[in-house]
Structure formats: C-alpha cells, structure tokens
C-alpha cells in the first residue's frame, strides 16, 4: 500500500496513485487536484470507497473546475458527489459497462494560507451529514 507518484510529460503531469484506506489516505493529503479517476468498483463490492467522508475529502482536495470520472453509475455516488459541490452526469460507459459518471467541481473552497487541515475539513461537515450513500 501507500502513495505512488508517477511524473509524465516532462514532469508537467503528476499522477498520484493511492493504495490503502481511501478516507485515511486522502485525509493526510494537502493538494489542489485538477482531475480524479475513481476506480473503486461498485458500492456494493467496495462500500469503503463511496462514503460521505471520502466525498468530502475529494471536494476538499479539488481545485476549482476539477474534473472527476468513475466507472460506477450508482445513484448514491452521483448524489453524494453532488452534495459536496460536483455537477455530475451519467455518461456512456466503456466496454461492457453501460453507463459511468463524469462531472466537475463548480468552485473549490478557498482557504487562507497556513490554514490547518482540520479547519479545512470542517467546511464540508454539513455536506458530510447530508450524504447517505449505500
């Protein structure tokens, strides 16, 4: 497990792969992420990947306009991501997958320089309480 970084395109693109407890790993990051690909299987097979806490961490770490895509098309995932600020849509899937989800964060929460991570997280606590994915 752990964090695995791959630099591409003369180091102008940074790909960060996370292997482990997703909410804990995201909670330890400070970043401004432009694009997400969530490959965590369907909520029925990997429920830890699709929690309100994970959605809140994704929103906290996202830059304004951040794009997000995932193979799952589950309504609970779509609604959970929408509750933390993503505009999500069902799209045509890939291969045998009929539908998938894609979207973007309308506007990232701005924080003053030096703001502690715990204070940053509190901005999403209200959304976290509303979210009820399976």
Question: Whereabouts are the PLM-identified features?
Answer:
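SAM-dependent transferase fold signal centered on methyltransferase-like domains
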Residues: 26, 58-60, 83-86
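Short SAM/SAH-binding signature in class I
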Residues: 15-17, 31-40
